[in-house]
């Protein structure tokens, strides 16, 4: 991506003439701002094209070099995540449900992560663990670990994940604790939690949505245009492999912010590699690179029905024969929406919250991953969510 960006800079150099496609908008902008027309020759003559190209080349090479240094430093870093593994409480159709402790009489909480990345982002660091924070507040949290598509039949779709894993997990919790669980969903996991909240309200005491998308057309059209143009290739890949491979899924999300990879590794290159910040960077980057493929039918639903056709907001997303309508959710609902999220834009998450009657919306000045693993996550997300759950459970 860094190399491609550099090449695009060179390719974007325009002829030094008033007739350049780029110079016309510049002229218009200057005239609108100053009220005076810009003489195209006067400004272009002040720039030596050779010097400009040389300066651009040096800057590009410096950025690439620093980027490469950062990548190498990350790959060679000896630090790795060393968190103790939680107990496996039970399984839902072979999917593990992880037990994070807490009192047996506490309010049970089932946390549902996204299908795209592994669940341990919710338990990444000792002092930045959403799951352990819930337990520390006297709740009894469980984590549904989706692992990877090999745990289901290759033809498994979202109906299978919800009807054969998510709902049975909620049934198990109610059977053991004699009370329904508070259901918490992060990212795509939050979107999925709306299904049992509609289909089996008897199993859901309350609902917490963390950066959960619903209106997939609330962002720019770039991703949708790319999906539309690439659909034939994507469908062929999914049909051939039976899944959307990790590299494909990661490429889609990198495309949401193409310069992020370069920026973060150049920043890492400047860090003290023995610092706490550097070690946290390594752990987080390891998690990001530890992705899982999407089962073929799930990939088609997410990419084409959700992102391309906006099936959720249009009332076209079904589990079985039932349309999932957030308007039918009657349980207490909290939506935590990070205002700096570039993966699930706030407008997308807000659309879901606004469809649920009486929902509470909490905005936090954090990013998509920062709300779970950032230095301010404990104060701004963990504690308020735990307090809200405790308050709901006591009523």
Residue spans for each PLM region:
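Short beta-strand immediately N-terminal to the catalytic nucleophile in serine-hydrolase-like folds
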Residues: 183-185, 210, 336
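Short alpha-helix in the alpha/beta-hydrolase fold that links the catalytic acid
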Residues: 331, 345-354
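Catalytic histidine-centered segment of alpha/beta-hydrolase-like enzymes
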Residues: 343-346, 366-380
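Alpha/beta-hydrolase-fold enzymes
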Residues: 1-49, 175, 192-297
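Alpha/beta-hydrolase active-site loop
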Residues: 155-175
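Short, surface-exposed "cap/lid" segments of acyl-processing enzymes
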Residues: 74-77, 82-150
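Gly/Ala-rich beta-loop-alpha elbow adjacent to hydrolase catalytic centers
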Residues: 184-189, 193
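Short beta-strand/loop motif that positions the catalytic acidic residue
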Residues: 329, 335-337, 341
């Amino acid at each position: 991506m860094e190399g491609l960006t550099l090449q695009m800079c060179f390719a974007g150099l325009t002829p030094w003439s008033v007739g350049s496609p780029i110079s016309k908008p510049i002229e218009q902008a200057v005239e609108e701002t100053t009220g005076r027309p810009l003489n195209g020759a006067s400004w272009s003559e002040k720039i030596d094209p050779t010097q400009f190209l040389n300066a651009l080349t040096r800057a590009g090479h410096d950025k690439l070099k620093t980027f490469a240094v950062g990548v190498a430093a990350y790959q060679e870093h000896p630090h790795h995540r060393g968190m103790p593994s939680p107990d496996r409480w039970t399984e839902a159709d072979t999917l593990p449900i992880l037990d994070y402790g807490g009192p047996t009489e506490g309010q049970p909480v089932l946390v549902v992560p996204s299908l795209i990345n592994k669940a341990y982002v919710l338990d990444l660091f000792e002092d930045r663990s959403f799951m352990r924070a819930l337990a520390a507040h006297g709740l009894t949290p469980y984590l549904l670990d989706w692992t990877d598509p090999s745990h289901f039949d290759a033809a498994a779709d979202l109906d299978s994940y919800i009807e054969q894993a998510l709902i049975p997990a909620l049934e198990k919790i109610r059977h053991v604790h004699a009370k329904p669980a508070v259901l918490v969903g992060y990212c795509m996991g939050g979107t999925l939690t709306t299904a049992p909240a509609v289909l089996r309200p008897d199993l859901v005491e309350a609902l917490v949505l963390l950066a959960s998308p619903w209106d997939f057309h609330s962002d720019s059209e770039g991703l949708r245009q790319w999906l539309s143009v690439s659909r034939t290739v994507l469908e062929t890949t999914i049909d051939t492999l039976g899944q959307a491979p990790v590299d494909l899924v990661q490429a889609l999300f990198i495309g949401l912010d193409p310069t992020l990879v370069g920026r973060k590794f150049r920043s890492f290159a400047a860090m003290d590699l023995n610092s706490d910040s550097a070690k946290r960077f390594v752990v987080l980057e390891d998690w990001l690179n530890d992705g899982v493929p999407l089962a073929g039918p799930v990939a088609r639903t997410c990419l084409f029905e959700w992102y391309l056709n906006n099936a959720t907001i249009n009332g076209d997303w079904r589990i079985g024969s039932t349309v999932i309508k957030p308007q039918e959710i009657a349980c207490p609902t909290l939506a935590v929406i990070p205002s700096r999220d570039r993966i699930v834009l706030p407008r997308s998450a807000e659309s879901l919250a606004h469809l649920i009657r009486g929902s509470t919306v909490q905005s936090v000045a954090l990013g998509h991953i920062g709300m779970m693993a950032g230095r301010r996550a404990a104060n701004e997300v963990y504690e308020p969510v735990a307090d809200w759950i405790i308050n709901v459970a006591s009523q």
